Every structure is written in structure tokens, then in C-alpha cells.
A protein has these predicted regions:
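Long, contiguous interaction/recruitment modules in multidomain scaffold/adaptor proteins
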Residues: 1-43
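Alpha-helical segment of the N-proximal tetratricopeptide repeat
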Residues: 36-69, 73
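Residue-level recognition of tetratricopeptide repeat
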Residues: 71, 105, 139-141
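Terminal, low-structured helical/coil segments at or just beyond the last alpha-helical repeat
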Residues: 126-159
Length: 159
């Protein structure tokens, strides 16, 4: 099943493979990380899992191998890893490119809002919070709750 069908890479998948390799979920083994070895969607999800595991540089290296790096999801993940490396303004640039492609992508708006909080721009973060509420149809969605937490806790992320 592909991540677009709701599966995400797990921490177990990350520890299975050494640096420079990527987990092939379908065939259950590690492959040398190179362009085209897996569909872009799978590579992007693996990159995001690397970033969530604090392996930001590896995440960016994986995203560099995408055949089409200019999807909303790939740009969001690049923004996330870049921001986590301390390059907040550069990360914001990737988030804004992602939003140009898909203005209704709630997760990128959450991460953009978190970046604004880090810069002290709470007003801009609250604008993203309002957009997320409209996208989700309520305030009862993970992206809204996570950004609301970051705003009220000076940029701290929920665990």
C-alpha cells in the first residue's frame, strides 16, 4: 500500500536501513537510496519519516533524489527539514511554494504557522490557524490543535 493510501513510514522502517538506504515497504527490504528506486511518493514519505526522527540532513538528501521535487507534499517536507535545521526563513519559502500548489493542504499551513511563531510573528501564525479551521471544517483536526499549541506555548511542538 502506498503512503497516499494512508500508510506512513515508521521508526522501525528507519532503523531497518543504514544511512544511504531506503526501505521498500512493498518488498520488505532496504535498497540503495537513489533516484527512481521507488516512486516519488514513497521516497517523500521516507524523507518525512527521517525528518520526524531528527535526521534532517538525510531527509533533504532523500528529497534531492525525487524525480519531481515540486509537489506540495515534497516542498512541505523540504520546508520542515530545512526549518528544523534552523533555517527558518528558507523553510518558509518552501512552505509558500507548497501552498501555491495546494492552498488547502492543512499540514503545510500548520508548519508555516509554527515557523512564523519561531520568528515572533504570532499574527501570521494565527492567520494560518484560521485557514486550517476553514480547511478542516472545524477546529477539531490535528493540524489546528498542533498549531494552536505552538502559538500558546511560544513555538513548542506537541510531543
Amino acid at each position: 500500500m502506498s503512503p497516499s493510501a494512508g500508510q506512513r513510514q515508521t521508526q522501525e522502517d528507519l532503523t531497518t536501513c543504514r544511512r544511504g538506504q531506503i526501505w521498500d515497504r512493498r518488498h520488505k527490504h532496504c535498497l540503495k537510496r537513489k533516484s527512481g528506486v521507488l516512486p516519488d511518493a514513497d521516497m517523500a514519505e521516507y524523507a518525512y519519516a527521517l525528518a520526524k526522527a531528527d535526521r534532517y540532513a538525510e531527509a533533504l538528501e532523500t528529497l534531492d533524489l525525487l524525480q519531481n521535487p515540486n509537489t506540495a507534499r515534497a516542498l512541505n517536507y523540504r520546508g520542515y527539514a530545512t526549518r528544523k535545521l534552523g533555517r527558518t526563513q528558507e523553510g518558509i519559502g518552501f512552505y509558500l511554494k507548497s501552498i501555491e500548489i495546494d492552498p488547502n493542504y492543512a499540514q503545510v499551513r500548520e508548519y508555516l504557522g509554527e515557523a512564523y511563531v519561531l520568528q515572533g510573528n504570532v499574527g501570521a501564525a494565527k492567520e494560518q490557524l484560521n485557514r486550517i479551521a476553514k480547511i478542516c471544517g472545524s477546529t477539531d483536526c490535528e493540524e489546528y490543535e498542533d498549531l494552536e499549541f505552538a502559538i500558546s506555548h511560544n513555538g513548542e511542538e506537541k510531543s
